[in-house]
């Protein structure tokens, strides 16, 4: 069995996008803790391959990978939780869709991090 890949569709709750962007930019700035958060999430079995914003007010689309054995329910809990992409702000509504790589003859959008 292999790791799991997901497309996550994020929509901002009304009036929350500017606070989310401010928080995201602060986290990604030098000393903001981004690298540590990425490492901690990877240790727990979650890895974000890409984040793709359509506009500043959303939506955003991300490609995530989870290590083998993590259920879609556990992934949703992580995505909605304080260490997920919402930074604990309750700013995002998150729709997680598993990618069925068997439909594309095993092709993945990115090389797997968890093998």
What is each PLM-predicted segment?
Residues 1-59, 65-77, 96-115:
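Short S/T/G/P-rich N-terminal loop/turn motif that feeds into the first structured element of a domain
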Residues 79-90:
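A common structural junction motif
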């Amino acid at each position: 069995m292999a790791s799991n890949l997901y497309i996550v569709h994020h929509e901002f709750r009304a009036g929350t996008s500017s606070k989310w962007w401010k928080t995201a930019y602060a986290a990604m700035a030098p000393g903001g803790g981004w690298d540590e958060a990425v490492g901690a999430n990877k240790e727990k079995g979650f890895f974000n391959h890409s984040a793709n914003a359509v506009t500043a007010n959303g939506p955003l689309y991300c490609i995530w990978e989870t290590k083998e054995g993590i259920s879609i329910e556990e992934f949703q809990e992580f995505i909605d939780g304080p260490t997920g992409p919402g930074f604990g702000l309750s700013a995002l509504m998150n729709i997680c869709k598993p990618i069925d790589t068997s439909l594309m003859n095993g092709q993945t959008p990115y090389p797997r991090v968890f093998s």
